[in-house]
Amino acid sequence: MSKLFWATLSFISRLPVPSRWAQGLDFEQYSRGIVMFPLIGAILGGLSGLIFILLQPWCGIPLAALFCILALALLTGGFHLDGLADTCDGIFSARRRERMLEIMRDSRLGTHGGLALIFVLLAKILVVSELALRGTPVLAALAAACAAGRGSAALLMYRHRYAREEGLGNVFIGKVSGRQTCVTLGLAAIITTVLLPGMQGLAAIVITLAAIFILGQLLKRTLGGQTGDTLGAAIELGELIFLLALL
């Protein structure tokens, strides 16, 4: 189990993990790491929140929010943001399904992808700033949001098909069992309600899961399945929806 945790951590983040800690684990086994997504999300969000706490007394709330969201992007290497941009480039191209998937595979950033990145990043900065002004503990909010965002991605894996013939997303999409999905969603709910006691955390995770489930169905109808890019988009949008639900 520890090897699976370290392998999953190195797969979905840029935190340095010694290769020997995940040695001996086949790539095909990574799908079992879905249950680690909420915990890893909480760690990444907590580190981002720590940046906010350290910088806020020195530079104020808006700049601290800017740098903590930047830190979160760096901690993941922009992995999920890239998926968000590619997904928006493909979906909003309004082309045939096959052409949409080709556009999503293109490494160049399009207009729709650029607008999506600007909107999501700016929205996160503004929402974190507003939460801080309202007295919400930012570290707990970010840790919970990242746990919820990554946990909700399981909804785009279970009983979904991979829209392409090959790619990184194929490791998870359609390979996750119902039990693993329930454990993942349950762990995300536990983490969020522990970090944000009362109805606030519970309501936010319910809203997030409902929104991402609907997103998954819309993407399935449009693309014929899911890809690694749509998983990244779901994670980024899940984080933002959770934070918005806390307002």
From Swiss-Prot:
The chain crosses the membrane at residues 34-54, 59-79, 113-133, 138-158, 194-214. It is found in: Cell inner membrane. Its EC number is 2.7.8.26. It comes from the Bacteria. Keywords: Cell inner membrane, Cell membrane, Cobalamin biosynthesis, Magnesium, Membrane, Transferase, Transmembrane, Transmembrane helix. GO terms for cellular component: plasma membrane. Its main location: membrane. Pathway: Cofactor biosynthesis; adenosylcobalamin biosynthesis; adenosylcobalamin from cob(II)yrinate a,c-diamide: step 7/7. GO terms for biological process: cobalamin biosynthetic process. It catalyses: alpha-ribazole + adenosylcob(III)inamide-GDP = adenosylcob(III)alamin + GMP + H(+); alpha-ribazole 5'-phosphate + adenosylcob(III)inamide-GDP = adenosylcob(III)alamin 5'-phosphate + GMP + H(+). One of its GO terms (molecular function) is adenosylcobinamide-GDP ribazoletransferase activity. Its cofactor is Mg(2+). Belongs to the CobS family. PANTHER family: ADENOSYLCOBINAMIDE-GDP RIBAZOLETRANSFERASE (PTHR34148:SF1). Joins adenosylcobinamide-GDP and alpha-ribazole to generate adenosylcobalamin (Ado-cobalamin). Also synthesizes adenosylcobalamin 5'-phosphate from adenosylcobinamide-GDP and alpha-ribazole 5'-phosphate. This is Adenosylcobinamide-GDP ribazoletransferase. It comes from Salmonella arizonae (strain ATCC BAA-731 / CDC346-86 / RSK2980). The gene is cobS.
